[in-house]
Amino acid sequence: MADADDSLALRAAWLHFVAGMTQSAVAKRLGLPSVKAHRLIAKAVADGAVKVTIDGDITECIDLENRLADLYGLDYCEVAPDIGEEGLPLMALGHAGANFMRREIEHGDHEVIGIGHGRTLSAAVGYMPRVMANDLRFVSLLGGLTRNFAANPHDVMHRIAEKTGMPAYVMPVPFFANTAEDREVLLAQRGVTTVFDMGCRAELKIVGIGTVDAQAQLVTSGMIELGEVEEIANLGGVGEMLGHFFNANGQWLETALTGRTIAASVENADMSRIVALAGGLSKVDAIRAVLKSGRLYGLITDERTAKALIGQPNGK
């Protein structure tokens, strides 16, 4: 967008959010079609020019956070209020994840922050405002070449670099190599090794959690075949994190994909903090499996999912 349009977007946003004018009134004031005014206001929001702050705590969510932390041994837990979304609660989780990332970036405690994959993390980066950062690098925690652009981590890393002004690195290799031998060849390349090691050493890893079924994003994005995920399900696989699979008891599973996966370790031996951003009733079993693995430092989820995770039927 040209500078003139940037200025116009800010003016439209100011009239709408500060002056309290309707979008049609903004359009009339600026001499624009209503559709144009709407797009300018939306652009200002997407660019992080509009920041909303709500003071105060939601008692019910805090109670859920404490109960989840106690039940699963979490050091950090955040529950976003239910806003009535159907299916995957992308708006609630996206805003909660965006606020978490903004706080972590502003605190300046990290040299490297690792970013996983998935629609929820993409939404969080999308909702995150522009943030001032210093001496910070972002790195993708998994191979970034996919056949489906919508699932491509490159876009997420580009946006987070744009919003922080800090460098963001992706691994220029597939998430899953064709063979274990191919994986070794790819990881032996100097540029790939550097980014892979950076991801493994990231002090903070923000990840998504996936299911092990036909609706899993790994399947719908074309990263793996349906038959492969069915094979993992037959082994007892329930949840997935960074291409690592877990059964209902939280035990890590060695699968046919294990030797082909190009992603950072999820072991906590390096003392990194792994924080998962995940929710939705369809993912409850997957999230519970990963929680039981003991590998998570923290969880950011939504209210209905939190209730289901502590045993309240249907998240009610």
UniProtKB/Swiss-Prot annotation:
It comes from Brucella abortus (strain 2308). One of its GO terms (molecular function) is DNA binding. Keywords: DNA-binding, Repressor, Transcription, Transcription regulation. Erythritol may act as an inducer, probably by binding to EryD and inhibiting its repressor activity. InterPro entries: NagB/RpiA_transferase-like, SorC_transcr_regulators, Sugar-bd_dom_put, WH-like_DNA-bd_sf. Disruption phenotype: Mutant shows increased transcription from the ery promoter. Represses the expression of the eryABCD operon, which is involved in erythritol catabolism. Induction: Induced by erythritol and negatively autoregulated. Signal peptide: none annotated. Coiled coil: none annotated. Residues 23-42 bind DNA. Belongs to the SorC transcriptional regulatory family. This is Erythritol catabolism regulatory protein EryD. PANTHER family: TRANSCRIPTIONAL REGULATOR LSRR (PTHR34294:SF1), TRANSCRIPTIONAL REGULATOR-RELATED (PTHR34294).
